[in-house]
Amino acid sequence: MIKDITIGQYVPGDSFIHKLDPRVKILISLIYIVDLFIVNSFKGYIFIVVFTLISILVSKVQFTYIYKGLKPIFILVLITAVLNIFMTGGANPPLFKWKFLVVYREGLIMAAFMALRLVFLIIGTSLLTLTTSPIELTDGIEKLLKPVSKIGVPSHELAMMMTIALRFIPTLMDETDKIMKAQIARGADLESGNLIQKAKNLVPILVPLFISSFRRADELAMAMEARCYRGGDGRTRMKELKLSNRDFIASLCALVLVCISILSRIWWGK
């Protein structure tokens, strides 16, 4: 299940979304995340679902990639939903009560909203990395952070760090999966015992994982040094980022979604 995490992976393609300017894709992703928290009604989420499905179809990314990305967070979504069910109070009489466990209608609604937000949050961020190459992502983040570089903020270095961290997620997950299988093959018991024992069982995984991470970081640093990497000063690009008509169309669609989200909150919100 660990190797199924899709955040940080890139799937090459020539779809409409693949060809969008990375700056536009990053901004649309941020707008999409904000929309998830603006909408507070199930009717409003219908538009979120439609926008998401259209984006997936236009990107030509297989639904299996999206499904694989959702599998690892199933437990997180379930725990979040359960906590919201039992920890959200309500003005109406409870639907269920047993000792200290009380379930209100408001708790069920909040649990459904939080589950939806988590699911679509993962889908949105996964779609960004699945359709944007590491170089494009770095250039896009650097361009967006360029205004703050005038006050001394190292925009290129920040963009590089964020991109490397994001791209290392699938690598680390794959490494973790290999280490777990190797330890199980050697007779390690990772499942039995109480919570404390399970935490102790993770030591044979975490130690080699940290060693592997430091080794990969050192190899990456040596590779960058061998290629005379000296930061963003004076760096040229093979392809300069330029906005096109498709970028304006995508931005317009995102703005329409924002307007619909705000109106849905006004019309159907609590």
Swiss-Prot record:
It is a multi-pass membrane protein. InterPro entries: ABC/ECF_trnsptr_transmembrane, ECF_transporter_component, EcfT. One of its GO terms (cellular component) is plasma membrane. It is found in: Cell membrane. CDD domains: EcfT (cd16914). The chain crosses the membrane at residues 36-56, 72-92, 108-128, 248-268. Keywords: Cell membrane, Membrane, Transmembrane, Transmembrane helix, Transport. Transmembrane (T) component of an energy-coupling factor (ECF) ABC-transporter complex. Unlike classic ABC transporters this ECF transporter provides the energy necessary to transport a number of different substrates. Forms a stable energy-coupling factor (ECF) transporter complex composed of 2 membrane-embedded substrate-binding proteins (S component), 2 ATP-binding proteins (A component) and 2 transmembrane proteins (T component). May be able to interact with more than 1 S component at a time. Belongs to the energy-coupling factor EcfT family. This is Energy-coupling factor transporter transmembrane protein EcfT. It comes from Clostridium kluyveri (strain ATCC 8527 / DSM 555 / NBRC 12016 / NCIMB 10680 / K1). The gene is ecfT.
